[in-house]
Design a protein with these regions (language model features):
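Juxtamembrane/interfacial segments at transmembrane-helix boundaries in multi-pass membrane proteins
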Residues: 1-21
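Membrane-embedded catalytic scaffold of the fatty acid hydroxylase/desaturase
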Residues: 14-169
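A membrane-cytosol interface segment of integral membrane proteins
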Residues: 160-195
Length: 195
């Protein structure tokens, strides 16, 4: 809010239905890129990895959220700079997050044509799998169309069941260590880097 006010950005009307729809779609695209970079940039993976460490895939997996995501907000700055009110962005982000809770399940197999447009349990199982063919796929939060557009979509194959977790398993159930391990490992790697 303060940054936008300081730049003199005019706030758009929060009572506009069109604004809510456009913000929902735009937020989905920005979430896709945040999530994709969250897997590809080590500094962001350090914040996100705890969510992927579970070797079980159920609703409790959705609750494994990080306590160290300090830079993810940067991806949503375009919405603020476009004049979208903070309450609209937070509301849309909350809807996105609530929706994602329900896709962390093995109890729903496939849901027809919706598999093409929405992130479904099947699409998201692929995202959580550590099978080589599934790694770094299906980053969308609500819409799977972003993965289809940007080339990261992978369909769940019935003859290749998902194996969950990260490629280098943590080997601990300690939640503090789950949140700090990749940070610690990154620090050790940085010490070995030639200067």
């Amino acid at each position: 809010g303060y940054l936008v006010q300081g730049l003199g950005v005019k706030q758009l009307p929060a009572d506009s239905i069109l604004l809510w729809v456009v913000t929902f779609v735009a937020y989905g695209c920005l979430y896709y890129w945040k999530h994709r970079f969250g897997h590809q940039w080590r500094i962001m993976w350090a914040s996100h990895s705890a969510h992927h460490q579970s070797e079980e895939y159920n609703l409790s997996t959705a609750l494994r959220q990080t306590s160290t995501d300090y830079i993810g907000f940067i991806f949503y700055l375009p919405l603020y700079l476009a004049g979208v009110p903070t309450e609209v962005i937070i509301s849309v982000g909350s809807l996105n997050l609530i929706y994602q809770f329900w896709v962390h399940t093995e109890h729903v197999r496939r849901i027809g044509f919706l598999e093409w447009v929405l992130v479904t349990p099947s699409n998201h199982r692929v995202h959580h799998a550590r099978n080589p063919e599934y790694v770094d796929k299906n980053y969308g939060g609500f819409f799977i169309i972003w993965d289809r557009i940007f080339g990261t979509f992978k369909d769940e194959e019935t003859d290749r069941p998902c194996v969950y977790g990260v490629t280098n398993q943590l080997g601990s159930f300690n939640p503090l260590w789950a949140n700090l391990y990749v940070w610690y490992d990154t620090f050790l790697i940085s010490l070995k880097t030639k200067r």
